[in-house]
A protein has these predicted regions:
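Glycine-/small-residue-enriched transmembrane alpha-helix faces in small-molecule transporters
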Residues: 1-40, 153-180, 188, 200-204
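Specific transmembrane alpha-helical segments of multi-pass solute transporters/efflux pumps
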Residues: 16, 58-102, 144
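Hydrophobic/small/kink-forming positions within alpha-helical transmembrane segments
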Residues: 18, 22, 44, 51, ...
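Hydrophobic/aromatic residues within transmembrane alpha-helices
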Residues: 27, 38, 42, 95, ...
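Structural motif at transmembrane-helix junctions in multi-pass transporters
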Residues: 30-37, 90-108, 185-188
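C-terminal transmembrane-helix exit sites in multi-pass transporters
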Residues: 49, 54, 111-136
């Protein structure tokens, strides 16, 4: 994939993610459903779509063979499915329910800054000037958003801030953890299985509702 294509896909993904937040906010005002239900339905429907794409690309058969040869890979898929996919979506929708889509999206997009800090600690090196600038701008932007420039008050509910930061942190995890899985599985198969696992993990909670 070319650098231009990668940048284009990242921009498209970010735009669609923000649009889904706006749609979720509208959904909450028009229905009695709660974030955990929306998350589960979204995961199951997305999983079905990605299974079709995996079948179309030939990755479904290869993925099943890999799991038969090494069933322990299901543990890694479960970790990514729950921590890297399910929680990032659930916390994002919870942030929107507690606050609004705009604030949740902006706070959640501190994930690149979190990744820079993680990699700096992981590789024991100082961030570059550009990376440092990214962290400073991200933190300053969130500070202005949540305080409105007044340190003595919050313009965004604390619950929204917490859920949004959880979403950002788990999104960072989702970008780092599955690198080794992408070497083993087709990307469509990986997403299909992990989204299915994430949806199943929510069943005990949604059945109680």
């Amino acid at each position: 994939m070319s650098h231009f294509s990668a940048v284009l896909l990242v921009l498209l993904a970010g735009t669609m993610w923000a649009a889904s937040g706006t749609a979720a906010q509208h959904f909450y005002t028009q229905s009695v459903h709660i974030p955990i239900e929306l998350t589960q339905v979204r995961l199951f429907l997305s999983s079905a779509l990605f299974f079709l794409l995996a079948w179309w690309s030939g990755g479904l058969r290869r993925g099943v063979r890999s799991l038969r040869r090494s069933p322990r890979l299901l543990v890694h898929l479960s970790i990514h499915g729950i921590l890297g996919i399910m929680i990032v979506q659930f916390s994002y929708f919870m942030g929107i329910a507690e606050g609004d889509a705009a604030a949740t999206t902006v706070i959640g997009y501190t994930s690149p800054a979190m990744m820079i800090l993680y990699l700096a600690v992981r590789w024991r090196r100082l961030p570059s000037a550009a990376e440092t600038g990214t962290v400073v701008v991200a933190v300053a932007g969130v500070f202005l958003l949540v305080t409105g420039g007044d340190v003595g008050r919050l313009s965004v509910p604390m619950a929204c801030i917490v859920w949004s930061l959880i979403s950002g942190a788990t999104f960072t995890f989702a970008m780092i953890y599955p690198v080794h899985l992408l070497r083993l599985f087709d990307r469509f198969f990986l997403l299909a299985v992990c989204m299915l696992i994430g949806g199943i993990a929510l069943l005990p909670m949604t059945q109680v509702i």
